[in-house]
């Protein structure tokens, strides 16, 4: 019996510039709304990962996800306020940055 490669295969989606800009605009809007709804006003990368999962960005597309997240939080909209613990299963307990609206 042949030994099969059991690694998970992903259908990697590539984004055009317009798709990327649209997704970024929607993610920043989502994060802004979420920050306004919370009494602490804090949003994290976990919140961005939740949005990207709902948008269909595969969990295996690490570079794509990080690119979206870094772009969203590096803009003028958010200020880094400290660190908190991640609640995502993939990063359980790791320290991640917390952001508030600028």
Positions of the model-derived regions?
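Long, low-complexity, charged/polar intrinsically disordered regions in eukaryotic proteins
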Residues: 1-22
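Positively charged, polyanion-binding regions of nucleic-acid-associated proteins
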Residues: 16-42
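Short amphipathic alpha-helical segments
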Residues: 28, 45-49, 66
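Short acidic, hydrophobic short linear motifs in intrinsically disordered regions
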Residues: 39-53
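Short, positively charged loop/turn segments that connect secondary-structure elements
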Residues: 53-68, 80-90
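Basic amphipathic alpha-helical segments that dock to polyanions
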Residues: 71-75
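Short, cationic-aromatic polyanion-contact patches
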Residues: 85-102
């Amino acid at each position: 019996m042949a030994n099969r490669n059991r690694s998970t295969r992903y259908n990697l989606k590539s984004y055009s510039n317009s798709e990327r800009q649209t997704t970024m605009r929607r993610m920043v809007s989502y994060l802004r709304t979420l920050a306004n709804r919370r009494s602490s006003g804090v949003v994290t990368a976990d919140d961005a990962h939740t949005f990207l999962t709902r948008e269909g960005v595969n969990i295996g597309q690490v570079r794509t996800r990080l690119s979206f997240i870094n772009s969203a939080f590096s803009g003028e909209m958010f200020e880094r306020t400290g660190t908190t613990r991640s609640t995502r299963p993939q990063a359980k307990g790791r320290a991640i940055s917390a952001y508030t609206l600028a």
